[in-house]
Amino acid sequence: MQAFTVHKGLVAPMDRANVDTDAIIPKQFLKSIQRSGFGPNLFDEWRYLDKGEPGQESVVRKPNPDFVLNQPRYQGASILLTRENFGCGSSREHAPWALGQYGFRVLIAPSFADIFFNNCFKNGILPIVLPESVVARLFDEVHGFVGYQLTIDLPRQVVIKADGTELPFEVQAFRKYCLVNGFDDIGLTLRHADKIKAFEAERLAKMPWLGQRLL
């Protein structure tokens, strides 16, 4: 997983509350057994005028010109600003996969659904909770300024605006540690690979029948 320390990026505003995971990545795309390739179908039913299906090339589809991520001023955005209860609905991990593969590294909202919130950290995305009044001001600024960017300093736990204003945010210490070091669950486990191998060797020495294969 890519480490996260300081990130500066363009902000895209999604002025919707209660965006659920089926809106983030519709159910028909969950059939894939691969963990990649979901970025083109992020917000699929809002992003395109035609219905998408797995394996369909996005270049042949009809983009919705009114959807925020299709507007030229927000191309290349890596920070998504949105409203309360983002990521509600089913607990599909495909939702943060799609967001990350599109290019988002940071999500900012007044609140997130719990399971989605946890899944973001496990997939290298930083979800930041800010007060609703602060989020509302950020929406005004993003809409009023083309090319609006923010800097996210995770070690210091602040969002930095272009004028230098710092907006503090909270993050649980273990989640912060994992993001800063680029550790997902597998990466954390592999840090203890030597101990795991030693345990397995000791266990097999004491109980060799556990190593026998069934025919």
From Swiss-Prot:
UniProt pathway: Amino-acid biosynthesis; L-leucine biosynthesis; L-leucine from 3-methyl-2-oxobutanoate: step 2/4
Keyword Lyase recorded: yes
Protein name per its UniProtKB record: 3-isopropylmalate dehydratase small subunit
Keywords per UniProt: Amino-acid biosynthesis, Branched-chain amino acid biosynthesis, Leucine biosynthesis, Lyase
Task of the protein: Catalyzes the isomerization between 2-isopropylmalate and 3-isopropylmalate, via the formation of 2-isopropylmaleate.
Subunit and interaction comment: Heterodimer of LeuC and LeuD.
Coiled-coil region(s): none
E.C. code: 4.2.1.33
Membrane-spanning intervals of the chain: none
InterPro entries per the UniProt record, alphabetical: 3-IsopropMal_deHydase_ssu, Aconitase/3IPM_dehydase_swvl, AconitaseA/IPMdHydase_ssu_swvl, IPMI_Swivel, LeuD
Family indicated by similarity: Belongs to the LeuD family. LeuD type 1 subfamily.
GO biological process: L-leucine biosynthetic process
Reactions catalysed: (2R,3S)-3-isopropylmalate = (2S)-2-isopropylmalate
Domain of life: Bacteria
